[in-house]
Amino acid sequence: MELRPFATLTLAVASDGLYMLGATPAGTRIVQEINEARISGPRLNATLVGNAAADWLAIDAQGVGTFDIRMTLMTDDGVPIYLAYKGRADWSGGMGKSPVFVGMEFEAGDERYRWLNALHLFGRGEVGEGGKLVYEIYEPI
């Protein structure tokens, strides 16, 4: 499979939006609200809008993190789009110590962005400066 760069996604989490649910059937469940997000690329540029953005993270007994992230973005030209992605990270050495690998999908109703509906993108995320999570996103070609 060949991949080409699609965009960079940078997220910041809300320090007051962390909810530790504890042990659940899925593992230790942590809900972390996202208060900043920006996706930047040659074909898509958008910023987080609204208050309904979070990661529903579960970490199993072996330290594997399973991510479930959803948010609404507003493109720079004023079109709302939905982004959802899931992925995994081997955090047996500690949270944030290894990359996060994800599969991403968009939903768009506006004709200018319907092309996003056909994509399944792949990302590699790392914890960067200031605790922000930075994903390099790739598109299969």
Predicted regions span which residues?
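Beta-strand-enriched cores of mature, soluble protein domains
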Residues: 1-141
